[in-house]
Amino acid sequence: MENEVTKWNKIIYSIMNLPGIKVDRVAFLVEALRPHCTEPEIKKASLQRPIDVIPLKLINQLANECINEHTKKATIFSTVTGVPGGIAVFFAIPADLLQYFCQTLIIAQKLAYLYGYPDLCDQNGHLTESSYDVLTIFLGVMLGSSTANEAFKQ
């Protein structure tokens, strides 16, 4: 089991180190909250847990907007890569899977930050050990795993 966990963490590490995949917690929260909140609320939410400062209804709305935005991106990419058909499918399928997991990891980070998780990266920009677990659980929930869903609720 430990070997599988190590391999999975290497996959997450590799994807998270691609350009544009890591979400800067503070920058994301400031950008997401700016149209809806005052500057003091934004500052407090970005330094603390947004869920403690912002109404849950707004957090849920922002979460749905993030999900919809990245679902559209994944769908567009998937459609474009599938158009050529034929031999190109051998290249399109791995590219499609990679971009799907990239979008899913971006959504996972954004949702984690909206609902009050601390920064998943340390001061050097590297994922913390517990971040791998958080991202794995979020991915499991997104993929429909009942076990991950139970772990998430705890």
Q: Where are the regions a protein language model picked out?
A:
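Hydrophobic alpha-helical membrane-embedded segments
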Residues: F91-Y113
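Terminal, membrane-proximal amphipathic helices
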Residues: M1-V80, L105-Q154
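Conserved phosphate/anionic-ligand binding catalytic regions in large, soluble enzymes, centered on
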Residues: F77-Q99
